[in-house]
């Protein structure tokens, strides 16, 4: 039996904006987000386009939800069908994060996604804080939110996903003591945060169909079968999570970065490297635009939900600062080849930091063509600036793995 007294007990809030895209769109149109019928669709011109968000009333009365298709929405004059306004969504999300800073210090906020955040309430009453946040959210933005509260980040997320969205108050709290009664009965396994379809099938073949059965399965057998993921599965099934809400970067620190959630799972190294090159190109372009160069290059790889999430984030500091695409790419390749474990990838990020002004950089004896490559980057930037981002692309962008061509002109992967 797990001795929970050996583990930290915090007051973590997981705040989720209810039908965020649909609700923001409704408020912008002067509609009540709780009672109107509204769907945000990837592209209203394509009948097969995916529903990105549906208002609560549309879900309840018409059965239309995230993942439905445009052609499935009934032709009813009461239903509003709109394209996503990604710039607006990002702006509202940023303002909501600022609202959180009124309740807790910035270092106690972790933005998990555009519509979901974790807050460490410290010694404050977490339930009172949750109610106050809900009240402020409705008063200032006209938006509803649900809140999960837990002794750690995992329990707060589980309280959110599995209970708070079903309660009248929109608030639920899970403590370590609630795990046997609330978590262990959960089935199918994929209802639990962090367990994807592939892992669920693997566990089912081992005779595990509930979280309770997973919690009681021998730890050594799980570790033998799944390695470190087996250890994580076991302890998550007991509600144990030692994740910390990370401190933010120092105010004023400059870096240039780009992160991308891929439109599908990438399993082949060559495909991942193609996307990586595109991202390095964009990071280098941003640095050049500001006449900056950087010495520290960071690579982040996020694994698919089917792989239990996770991933790695590693950095390397080079001798000569750069804003040259291939310099950044070579460094990222080195990090990728060293730390990538062969799992399915769903997100990639690259950051250039340790920034300084781009003025008469010292030429390396082994990089005599540095200045030519540097000037080439500026020429390519100029062409894109004048004729559009699709005017000149690297060959990888025209392969099935490339994303730059499709994402050109989009915000967050969708229409602006």
Curated annotation (Swiss-Prot):
Cofactors, names only: Mg(2+)
Pfam families on file: IMS, IMS_C, IMS_HHH_1
GO biological process: error-prone translesion synthesis; SOS response
Active-site residues (renumbered): 116
Superkingdom: Bacteria
Domain UmuC positions: 12-196
Positions contributing to Mg(2+) binding: 16, 115
GO MF annotations, alphabetized: damaged DNA binding; DNA-directed DNA polymerase activity; metal ion binding
UniProt keyword annotations, A-Z: DNA damage, DNA repair, DNA-binding, Magnesium, Metal-binding, Nucleotidyltransferase, Transferase
Cofactor note: Binds 2 magnesium ions per subunit.
UniProt family annotation: Belongs to the DNA polymerase type-Y family.
Protein name: Putative UV-damage repair protein UvrX
Species the sequence originates in: Bacillus subtilis (strain 168)
Gene: uvrX
């Amino acid at each position: 039996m797990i001795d929970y007294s050996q583990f930290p007990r915090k007051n973590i809030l997981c705040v989720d904006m209810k039908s965020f895209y649909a609700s923001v769109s409704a408020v912008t149109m002067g509609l009540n987000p709780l009672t109107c019928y509204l769907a945000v669709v990837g592209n209203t011109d394509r009948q097969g386009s995916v529903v990105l968000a549906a208002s609560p009333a549309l879900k309840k009365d018409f059965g239309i939800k995230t993942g439905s298709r445009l052609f499935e929405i009934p032709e009813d004059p009461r239903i509003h069908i709109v394209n996503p306004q990604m710039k607006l969504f990002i702006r509202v999300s940023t303002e909501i994060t600022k609202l959180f800073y009124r309740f807790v210090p910035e270092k106690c906020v972790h933005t998990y996604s555009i519509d979901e955040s974790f807050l460490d309430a410290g010694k404050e009453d977490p339930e009172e804080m949750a109610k106050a946040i809900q009240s402020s959210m409705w008063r200032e933005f006209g938006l509803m939110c649900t809140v999960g509260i837990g002794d750690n980040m995992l329990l707060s997320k589980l309280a959110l996903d599995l209970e708070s969205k079903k309660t009248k108050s929109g608030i639920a709290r899970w403590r370590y003591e609630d795990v046997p009664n609330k978590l262990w009965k959960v089935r199918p396994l994929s209802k639990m945060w962090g367990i994807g379809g592939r892992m669920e099938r693997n566990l089912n073949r081992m005779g595990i169909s509930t979280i309770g059965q997973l919690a009681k399965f021998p730890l050594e057998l799980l570790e033998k079968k799944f390695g470190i993921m087996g250890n994580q599965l076991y302890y998550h099934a007991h509600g144990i999570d030692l994740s910390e809400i990370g401190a933010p970067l120092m105010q004023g620190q400059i870096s240039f970065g780009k992160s991308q959630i891929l439109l599908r799972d990438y399993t082949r190294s060559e495909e991942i490297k193609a996307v990586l090159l595109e991202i390095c190109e964009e990071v280098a372009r941003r640095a050049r635009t500001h006449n900056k160069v950087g010495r520290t290059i960071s690579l982040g790889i996020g694994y698919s939900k089917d792989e239990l999430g996770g991933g790695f984030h590693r950095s390397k500091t080079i001798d000569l600062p750069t804003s040259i695409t291939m310099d950044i790419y070579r460094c990222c390749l080195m990090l990728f080849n060293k730390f990538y474990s062969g799992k399915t990838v769903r997100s990639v990020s690259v950051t250039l930091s340790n920034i300084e002004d781009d003025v008469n950089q010292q030429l390396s004896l082994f990089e005599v063509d540095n200045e030519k490559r540097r000037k080439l980057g500026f020429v390519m930037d100029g062409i894109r600036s004048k004729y559009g981002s699709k005017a000149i692309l690297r060959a990888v962008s025209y392969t099935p793995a490339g994303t730059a061509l499709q994402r050109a002109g989009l915000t967050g992967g969708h229409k602006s």
